[in-house]
């Protein structure tokens, strides 16, 4: 294992914060990828969390829009979605230049991130995913992770088309441990 993904209240279910988890993993000698979603925080809080991550030496980030709160364990919570995954990537890239989204100069050394994004290679429209991938590359994505791949033929076709971007793609593979786990994923994972 080279990296450990640390989710951001995955499936809109409240859990321990990702930044604290990343710090614990880093202190244990692991390399975390800090996932940030736009669902729960506005642009001020997202930029603050990015700077906090950099201060703690957590430089691998995965920028996601996030699942709607209606899907989770607090469906009455108000989603934020001030930014989306592309604008969050742009914000991280801008912070690396020493400025924030408000045009303000940062104090001290600008952060440096390995910026990642998500792509869904098995969606109905590969072309739409390639357009999204291109927008994410233009915003600063340096690597991609796929959503779980269950259709190898679609994945192979997608990967052929995605070569044009020259970015590494980490494949999402989920191996159900039981039939019950498979049923749970089918019914509960967004």
Feature map (PLM): residue ranges:
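Active-site mouth loops of central-metabolism enzymes
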Residues: 10, 32-44, 113-128
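Acidic (Asp/Glu)-rich catalytic clusters
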Residues: 19-29, 50-58, 105-108, 134-137, ...
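Catalytic-face loop-and-helix region of soluble metabolic enzyme cores
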Residues: 172-190
């Amino acid at each position: 294992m080279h990296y450990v993904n640390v989710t951001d209240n995955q499936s809109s279910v409240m859990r321990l914060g990702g930044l604290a988890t990343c710090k614990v993993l880093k202190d244990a000698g692991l390399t975390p990828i800090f996932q940030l979603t736009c669902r729960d925080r506005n642009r001020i809080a997202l930029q603050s969390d990015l700077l906090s991550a950099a201060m703690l030496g957590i430089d691998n980030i995965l920028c996601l829009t996030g699942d709607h709160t209606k899907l989770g364990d607090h469906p009455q919570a108000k989603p934020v979605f001030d930014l989306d995954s592309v604008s969050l990537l742009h914000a991280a890239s801008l912070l690396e230049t020493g400025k924030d989204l408000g045009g303000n100069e940062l104090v001290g050394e600008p952060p440096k991130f390995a910026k990642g994004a998500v792509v869904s290679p098995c969606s109905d429209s590969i072309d739409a995913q390639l357009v999204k991938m291109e927008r994410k590359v233009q915003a600063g994505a340096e690597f991609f992770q796929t959503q779980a791949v269950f259709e190898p033929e679609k994945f192979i076709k997608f990967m052929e088309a995605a070569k044009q971007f020259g970015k590494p793609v980490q494949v999402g593979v989920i191996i159900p441990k039981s039939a019950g786990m498979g049923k749970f994923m089918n019914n509960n994972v967004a």
